[in-house]
Amino acid sequence: MIEWTILSSLASALLAGGGTYLVYKKVSNANYKIHLEKAKARARAIEHEAEMILQEAKIRAKELEIGAKSKYENETSKVIKEYESYLIKLEKQEAKNQQRLERETQQLEEERRRINHKQASLSGMIEELEKLKGDYRSKLTESLEILSRVAGLTQEEAKELALAKATEESRAQIAQIVRKYESEAKEEGRKRANYILAQATTRFAGEFAAERLINVVNLPNDELKGRIIGKEGRNIKTLEMLSGVDVIIDDTPGAIVLSSFNLYRRAIATRTIEALVEDGRIQPARIEEVYKKVEQEFEEKVLEEGEGIVLDMELGYVHPELKKLIGRLKYRASYGQNALGHSLEVANLAGVIAGELGGDVKLAKRAGLLHDIGKALTHDFGGSHVDLGAEVCSRYKEHPVVINAIFAHHGHEEAKSIESAAVCAADALSAARPGARREVLESFLKRVQEIEKIAMEKLGVRQAYAINAGREVRVIVNADLINDEESVLLAQEIAKEIETKVQYPGEIKVSVIREVRAVEFAK
């Protein structure tokens, strides 16, 4: 009975296990099919995505191909245009060379005709001298015979007497011939010089604009005038002390005026005020910050301008410091004539004159551009612009012809070359043009420069600025070297020396400014 029960239980268990297995198998098969379908769907999705990526890649490749083709066409077109431009330049240069060749050929032909004319003249003179010699011999023989017959002289005595008389007559005739040909030579030289100067002045006509002593800064509104003045005048005092420029604020609507004989200071002050107006923040610390930034920008600007001029004139290598000084000539005037404009005019005229005389055109232009380079230094250093220019050009190993031209254009030396002589002639032409220079203005500028120089020579002086049309000089001293009592004595000393050395109308106010700043940082 028990065995039967066990067997029944085992059979039931087997039947139950088999049913469970069948159910599990069916479920597994169903899950497999589901997973299989999902896998197929994923595979189809991946395949579709791959097709999309491939399609996008083909489109992208097509776009890149089109872009590359377009870029290639653009670059090719650019190269073709550059080549065409280069060919045009070559053609123009060839035309210029051809014109120059024709002009030089014409000049050579004229020179050949002139030489032939001189040779013919010399041949005529030789024939005339031979004729004179023949006449002299015949007259000598005749005189000897007459003297021997009439005076009873020996032949030797008669010969000496006749020789003395013939020599005197010959000298007079020869002197007359020499004077004649000297006169012709001088006239020929004068005509040649006039021709060269005419060629130079007609081939180069420079513009001229007289420099002024003021700059006008336009303001968006008159409210800014009060902000520029600042509380108790602090802003305007800071600006005037930094720049050495007289800031004039009057009833003129929408404008203020900056006055100074120094164009460079005035230009920096003008740009500083324009930058402050654009920025809107106007107070002493900001004014100092903007002024230093503008000053640095101008240092870079003058170097760029100098480099551009040297490049345009094709002068080759020029020392960077000389380029900077060339750029600073733009902010320097002499007798109301802009120094850079004058130097460029002299350079071009000197090149033309040297070319006509058979000299080195490029060297003449170089000497002409640098002949007044010392004027860029006269505001900062004492002495003649000739000596300063020669010194700085010697320091930077300039050509001896350049240094000779610097000395020669003011008569300190004789011109030792065609190029130096061309610079001297060009300088005289540029300066002598009607209206090119103003003597009264130059005498005023020299006076205010002398006033500043007297103040700057004193121990402890950091800066000195002549303002108010030279009626006041502001002297900024080093507070560590000069105390308050010494400031009073310094003002008296400067005033006394100005009275002794400078001629001026009215009176000059000497203001010594001693500023002490204590700076500490909270950490």
Curated annotation (Swiss-Prot):
Query: Per the database record, which ranges form the KH domain?
Result: 213-279
Which cellular component terms (GO) are annotated to the entry? Answer: plasma membrane
Its EC number(s): 3.1.-.-
Protein's UniProt keywords contain RNA-binding:
yes
Q: Does the keyword Signal apply?
A: no
One function term, GO molecular function aspect? RNA binding
Q: Which PROSITE patterns match?
A: HD, KH_TYPE_1
Span of the secretion signal? none
Q: Which residues form the HD domain?
A: 339-432
What highest taxon heads this organism's lineage?
Bacteria
What is the membrane topology noted in the UniProt record heading this document?
A: Single-pass membrane protein
Q: Name one GO biological process term.
A: mRNA catabolic process
Q: Which Pfam families match?
A: HD, KH_1, RNase_Y_N
**InterPro entries the record matches:** HD/PDEase_dom, HD_domain, HDIG_dom, KH_dom, KH_dom_type_1, KH_dom_type_1_sf, Ribonuclease_Y, RNase_Y_N
Q: Where in the cell is it found?
A: Cell membrane
Keyword vocabulary terms for this entry: Cell membrane, Endonuclease, Hydrolase, Membrane, Nuclease, RNA-binding, Transmembrane, Transmembrane helix
Q: Per the UniProt record, which residue ranges are transmembrane?
A: 7-24
Q: What does this protein do?
A: Endoribonuclease that initiates mRNA decay.
Family in the record: Belongs to the RNase Y family.
- This one is known as Ribonuclease Y
Q: Which gene encodes it?
A: rny
